[in-house]
């Protein structure tokens, strides 16, 4: 008999705990693992890969939702619309770079007026 562990039988019949809850995530780790396996990205998929992927996707979603919520609040709205997502993504330098090739349906465009088109300042010095 080795002196490691507490000995005795292992617990059986315990309540099943999802990998998402073990990792403290909302995104589905098991579903992402299945998608990675079925997608023919590699022959084998490590146990940590879907957890890491779920964490990254959850972080990105939370970041976009927070910025979109701020944009909605700035426009005095309580519901996030595609326009708010567009404003959030395009006003954030890093998200804009990440989603440069993405078109958001019903998102509109950023308001932008070229400086040369603005009326000239008439700074007449009166004495």
Swiss-Prot record:
The modification N5-methylglutamine is found at residue 106. Residues 1-20 have a biased composition (Basic residues). Belongs to the histone H2A family. Core component of nucleosome. Nucleosomes wrap and compact DNA into chromatin, limiting DNA accessibility to the cellular machineries which require DNA as a template. Histones thereby play a central role in transcription regulation, DNA repair, DNA replication and chromosomal stability. DNA accessibility is regulated via a complex set of post-translational modifications of histones, also called histone code, and nucleosome remodeling. The modification Phosphoserine is found at residue 2. The modification N6-acetyllysine is found at residues 6, 9, 11. Its main location: nucleus. There is a cross-link at residue 121 (Glycyl lysine isopeptide (Lys-Gly) (interchain with G-Cter in ubiquitin)). Residues 1-23 are annotated as: Disordered. Keywords: Acetylation, Chromosome, DNA-binding, Isopeptide bond, Methylation, Nucleosome core, Nucleus, Phosphoprotein, Ubl conjugation. It is found in: Nucleus; Chromosome. This is Histone H2A. It comes from the Eukaryota. InterPro entries: Histone-fold (IPR009072), Histone_H2A (IPR002119), Histone_H2A/H2B/H3 (IPR007125), Histone_H2A_C (IPR032454), Histone_H2A_CS (IPR032458). The lineage of its organism: Eukaryota, Metazoa, Ecdysozoa, Nematoda, Chromadorea. One of its GO terms (molecular function) is structural constituent of chromatin. Gene3D superfamilies: Histone, subunit A. One of its GO terms (biological process) is DNA repair. GO terms for cellular component: nucleosome; nucleus. Monoubiquitination of Lys-121 gives a specific tag for epigenetic transcriptional repression. The nucleosome is a histone octamer containing two molecules each of H2A, H2B, H3 and H4 assembled in one H3-H4 heterotetramer and two H2A-H2B heterodimers. The octamer wraps approximately 147 bp of DNA. It holds the Pfam family Histone. The modification N-acetylserine is found at residue 2.
